[in-house]
């Protein structure tokens, strides 16, 4: 489904989408990320073959580069409280929900809010707290521009730092 919103706030708008979603597997792509041809098929098959898992996460890289947004783990691993920061990025995870398990993002976190980042970390930590199990696959890639080295965008850096600080 495509829903257009005039209101700012990444988490606020993701929540709007979650509330009208009619599927069970939910992903959170950006408009500038790119899935590989088989990404969605792999996600669906993972959930079908591993019913105890409810979160699938993978790596992000800038296309044609050996780096991506932030530092990510290089080994396949279960998601744990202590490794969410290096195994989950906003665009790299999918959740297999049942309606009664629906969880919303904190609208105070993420782009467009005062605390301009950290929404995905907070979200996955909440899911783990609810008993969800997740798996990280470093060899599965979602491409996304890394936006590295833009040291002149102090406002963006400040907003992201506030979000990170709110999480830690």
Language-model segments: what does each one mean?
Residues 5-21:
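Glycine-rich, basic loop-to-helix element that forms the pyrophosphate-binding segment
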Residues 110-125:
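Acidic donor-binding loop at a coil-to-helix junction in glycosyltransferase catalytic cores
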């Amino acid at each position: 489904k495509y829903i257009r919103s005039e209101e700012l706030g990444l988490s606020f708008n993701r929540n709007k989408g979650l509330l009208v979603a009619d599927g069970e597997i939910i992903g959170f792509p950006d408009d500038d990320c790119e899935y590989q041809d088989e990404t969605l098929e792999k996600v669906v098959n993972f959930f079908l073959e591993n019913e105890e898992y409810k979160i699938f996460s993978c790596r992000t890289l800038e296309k044609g580069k050996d780096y991506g947004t932030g530092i990510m783990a290089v080994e396949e691993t279960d998601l744990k409280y202590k490794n969410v920061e290096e195994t989950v990025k906003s665009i790299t995870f999918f959740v297999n929900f049942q309606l009664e398990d629906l969880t919303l993002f904190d609208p105070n976190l993420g782009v467009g809010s005062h605390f301009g980042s950290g929404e995905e970390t907070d979200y996955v930590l909440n899911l783990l707290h609810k008993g969800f199990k997740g798996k990280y696959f470093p060899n599965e890639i979602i491409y996304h521009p890394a936006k590295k080295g833009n040291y002149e965008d102090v406002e963006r850096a400040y907003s992201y730092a506030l979000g990170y600080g709110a999480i830690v």
